[in-house]
Amino acid sequence: MMRTRKGHKVYPLTVAQKFHMYYAPHCPSMAVLNIGTSLTIEVELDWEQLKKSINEAYARSEAMRVRFARDKEGTWYQYVTDPEEMDIEFADFSGGTVEEAEAQMQQWTTVPFKMFDSPLTRIVMIRMPDGFNGVYFL
């Protein structure tokens, strides 16, 4: 039985997490677990301040820092990493169309997350062609 992972206490999975781990290997892609959404506003943003704010959210929210691991017997566990500065991506879609931007964001959603010892969230700061700016959460 795993007690710690990379110096962090481990916890059993919730019923919902166990269900995901049960059916996910039978799916064509682990991206079946991904949900992507954008949040934008029609105003110019201070991108450095937004990046700083996103990192503060990561620091405050343990749920955004959950990682999964398996022990030698194959049992899944979860653990929470310490806060660290994340490299927040920026995508400038202002030179294209809204449809092209949406297609790219949909493509991001098709990429599965690594399930072992890796982040399970992704946030991209986005500048849209229609003058809206914000973030894409995945």
At which residue positions do the language-model features occur?
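Short, charged/polar, Gly/Pro-enriched secondary-structure boundary elements
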Residues: 83-89
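Acyl-group handoff/entry surfaces in thioester-processing enzymes
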Residues: 3-81, 95-138
